Swiss-Prot record:
<feature type="transmembrane region" description="Helical">
    <location>
        <begin position="140"/>
        <end position="160"/>
    </location>
</feature>
<keyword id="KW-1003">Cell membrane</keyword>
<keyword id="KW-0812">Transmembrane</keyword>
<keyword id="KW-0472">Membrane</keyword>
<feature type="transmembrane region" description="Helical">
    <location>
        <begin position="210"/>
        <end position="230"/>
    </location>
</feature>
<feature type="transmembrane region" description="Helical">
    <location>
        <begin position="104"/>
        <end position="124"/>
    </location>
</feature>
<dbReference type="InterPro" id="IPR017039">
    <property type="entry name" value="Virul_fac_BrkB"/>
</dbReference>
<dbReference type="InterPro" id="IPR023679">
    <property type="entry name" value="UPF0761_bac"/>
</dbReference>
<feature type="transmembrane region" description="Helical">
    <location>
        <begin position="183"/>
        <end position="203"/>
    </location>
</feature>
<comment type="similarity">
    <text>Belongs to the UPF0761 family.</text>
</comment>
<feature type="transmembrane region" description="Helical">
    <location>
        <begin position="244"/>
        <end position="264"/>
    </location>
</feature>
<dbReference type="Pfam" id="PF03631">
    <property type="entry name" value="Virul_fac_BrkB"/>
</dbReference>
<keyword id="KW-0997">Cell inner membrane</keyword>
<feature type="transmembrane region" description="Helical">
    <location>
        <begin position="44"/>
        <end position="64"/>
    </location>
</feature>
<keyword id="KW-1133">Transmembrane helix</keyword>
<protein>
    <recommendedName>
        <fullName>UPF0761 membrane protein YihY</fullName>
    </recommendedName>
</protein>
<dbReference type="GO" id="GO:0005886">
    <property type="term" value="C:plasma membrane"/>
</dbReference>
Length: 290
């Protein structure tokens, strides 16, 4: 398989097809859909603990009280399908119940939220096929930093966007602000995926590969979100089957689909670098031939 791809790269015929074959081979070898299923399961298990920890962080900083409400609505409006309002009510009820837990239960919530971070780390390093492991203390520090600073940075960015929105009275900035707010979810997804693909793997990732893979993942995520919402709106047959429980399979499928997109972006990032190495090796062999 690699020899065929190498030959195609050597003769510079149909390089895109050769790259796509390499991408498909990696997806198959890494069992990407199985990894996505594992991450979806852990995500659903960690969803309420993760949201509870995030809301607790915002509660600890009074200056983010207004921003936390905006961030909550922004997340459910832009990162969940059309039934986000229903899911939001259920999750907020679960989080309210979790606030009544004891200190031991609160520690359990934090551990469960960190479990999601560990699963993401493990899945991405499986795709990058990295054998190097971080020290446990360092990994815990990174997970905790993401868990604590991530929501605060998101809240700060949302506060900035709200401030820009308040400047709409300035006619000269009106069009610019509208365009920025319109593409803000895409930019946020792009930056998030880029950081994920650049920081989490324990090996060095070329920045341009991470940017390309993150951009493709962000585009697929936004397109998938709109397509999924359109399907739910136009073909509501799931409601006839599941009734009031319809929100459960919708959330399951959406989380699984989201992780498929995230891991596909990672596979694209890896394949770009691997194909470039194969092409360089093929060109070197061509130069060495008499």
């Amino acid at each position: 398989m690699l020899k065929t791809i190498q030959d195609k790269a050597r003769h510079r015929t149909r390089p895109l097809w050769a790259w796509l074959k390499l991408l498909w081979q990696r997806i198959d070898e890494d069992n990407m859909t199985t990894l996505a299923g594992n991450l979806a399961y852990v995500s659903l298990l960690s969803l309420v603990p993760l949201v509870a920890v995030v809301f607790a962080l915002f509660a600890a900083f009074p200056m983010f009280s207004d921003v936390s409400i905006q961030l909550r609505h922004f997340i459910f409006a832009n990162f969940l399908p059309a039934t986000g309002d229903v899911i939001q009510r259920y999750i907020e009820q679960f989080v309210a119940n979790s606030n009544k837990m004891t200190a031991v239960g609160a520690c359990g919530l934090i551990v469960t939220a960190l479990l999601l971070m560990y699963s993401i780390d493990s899945a991405l390093n499986t795709i990058w096929r990295s054998k190097r492991a971080r020290p446990k203390i360092y990994s815990f520090a990174v997970y905790w930093m993401i868990l604590t600073l991530g929501p605060l940075l998101a809240g700060a960015s949302l506060a900035i966007s709200s401030y820009l929105f308040s400047l709409r009275w300035a006619s000269d900035l009106n069009t610019v602000i509208d365009n920025v707010l319109r593409i803000f979810p895409l930019l946020l997804s792009w930056i998030s995926f880029w950081l994920l693909y650049s920081i989490v793997p324990t090996i060095r990732v070329p920045n341009r590969d991470a940017i390309v893979g993150a951009f493709v993942a962000a585009l697929l995520f936004e397109a998938g979100k709109k397509g999924f919402a359109l399907y739910i709106t136009m073909f509501p047959s799931y409601q006839l089957i599941y009734g009031v429980l319809a929100v459960i399979p919708i959330l399951f499928v959406w989380v699984y689909w989201t992780w498929c997109i995230v891991l596909l972006g990672a596979e694209i990032t890896v394949t770009l670098g691997e194909y470039r190495k194969l092409k360089q090796a093929a060109e070197q062999e061509e130069d060495d031939e008499p």
